[in-house]
Amino acid sequence: MNINATARSLLLTEFVSAFFLAMRYFFKPKPTINYPFEKNPISPRFRGEHALRRYPNGEERCIACKLCEAICPAQAITIEAGPRRNDGTRRTVRYDIDMVKCIYCGLCQEACPVDAIVEGPNFEFATETREELYYDKARLLANGDRWEREIAKSIELDAPYR
């Protein structure tokens, strides 16, 4: 055994340095928050509960192009388009999302040419039954109406990166 190794083992330098490292972290402020009462701000790119948006005049944005249905890797979206209207546009008759299948990848939101389907800021949508996780058009539109202000703000903040 050489003198260096003997000195290190007698002086317990590794133990002392580990102790001081632990003490440094022990006295730092903790990053934990008191969750239900305090919430961290979420990113504008956060992908939470789905919502269908409307135009400011109240008309729904979805034009039944079915791009979101085609791009969904989990095949969680089902759309039925209604007949063409006099002005040549279409609207959806049925717009269902199976949230059990959804993987929250955000591809539906990226594919939508009119920003109709978005993933909103809500992350607290736990349910007691599986059937409550099958979202129909009415529920998606209600989510959009409820979260429109936050969704519009997130889209505006994310605009430079789109």
Curated annotation (Swiss-Prot):
GO cellular component, one term: plasma membrane
Disulfide bonds: none
Entry keyword annotation includes Iron-sulfur: yes
Residues holding [4Fe-4S] cluster 1: C62, C65, C68, C112
Keyword Cytoplasm found: no
Catalysed reaction, written as an equation: a quinone + NADH + 5 H(+)(in) = a quinol + NAD(+) + 4 H(+)(out)
Gene Ontology MF terms: 4 iron, 4 sulfur cluster binding; iron ion binding; NADH:ubiquinone reductase (non-electrogenic) activity; quinone binding
Top-level taxon in the UniProt lineage: Bacteria
Compartments it resides in: Cell inner membrane
PANTHER family, per the entry: NADH DEHYDROGENASE [UBIQUINONE] IRON-SULFUR PROTEIN 8, MITOCHONDRIAL, NADH DEHYDROGENASE UBIQUINONE IRON-SULFUR PROTEIN 8, MITOCHONDRIAL
Binding partners and assembly: NDH-1 is composed of 14 different subunits. Subunits NuoA, H, J, K, L, M, N constitute the membrane sector of the complex.
Protein name (record): NADH-quinone oxidoreductase subunit I 2
Name of the coding gene: nuoI2
